[in-house]
């Protein structure tokens, strides 16, 4: 079904049915009552929806074998990043595409006492 080998489609369908049941167990709030009562019902409904979404993500993550949190990508310090367009940058839509240039020393843009 989803291009996986080893997992049965029946297990995936059971998982999807379970998630569908969770969402169906929380119908939208009624439109009756005072403004404050409606607001409270909507607030509680949205909170339940958030809980159902969280539970559904955990169920699918467990079934599909995914990590709960994405692995953070290590980035170099921002102080060492610079945009360097001294080389041929190109003008046909590829401008700004490429790997960032990392300098050992960050250059001083305006030295003390210099004027533009």
Curated annotation (Swiss-Prot):
Region (Disordered): 25-49, 92-116
GO molecular function, one term: RNA binding
Start-end of Basic residues biased regions: 36-47
Residues found modified as Phosphoserine: 5, 8, 92, 99
Keyword set, alphabetical order: AIDS, Host cytoplasm, Host nucleus, Host-virus interaction, Methylation, mRNA transport, Phosphoprotein, RNA-binding, Transport
Subunit structure and binding partners: Homomultimer; when bound to the RRE. Multimeric assembly is essential for activity and may involve XPO1. Binds to human KPNB1, XPO1, TNPO1, RANBP5 and IPO7. Interacts with the viral Integrase. Interacts with human KHDRBS1. Interacts with human NAP1; this interaction decreases Rev multimerization and stimulates its activity. Interacts with human DEAD-box helicases DDX3 and DDX24; these interactions may serve for viral RNA export to the cytoplasm and packaging, respectively.
Note: HIV-1 lineages are divided in three main groups, M (for Major), O (for Outlier), and N (for New, or Non-M, Non-O). The vast majority of strains found worldwide belong to the group M. Group O seems to be endemic to and largely confined to Cameroon and neighboring countries in West Central Africa, where these viruses represent a small minority of HIV-1 strains. The group N is represented by a limited number of isolates from Cameroonian persons. The group M is further subdivided in 9 clades or subtypes (A to D, F to H, J and K).
Name recorded for this polypeptide: Protein Rev
């Amino acid at each position: 079904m989803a291009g996986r080998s080893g997992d049965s489609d029946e297990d995936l369908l059971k998982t999807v049915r379970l998630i569908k049941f969770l969402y169906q167990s929380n119908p939208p709030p009624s439109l009756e009552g005072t403004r404050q009562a409606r607001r409270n019902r909507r607030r509680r409904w949205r909170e339940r929806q958030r809980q159902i979404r969280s539970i559904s993500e955990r169920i699918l993550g467990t079934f599909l074998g995914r990590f709960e949190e994405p692995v953070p990508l290590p980035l170099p310090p921002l102080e060492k990043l610079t945009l360097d367009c001294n080389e041929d940058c190109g003008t046909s839509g590829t401008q700004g595409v490429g790997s960032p240039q990392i300098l050992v020393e960050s250059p001083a843009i305006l030295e003390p006492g210099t004027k533009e």
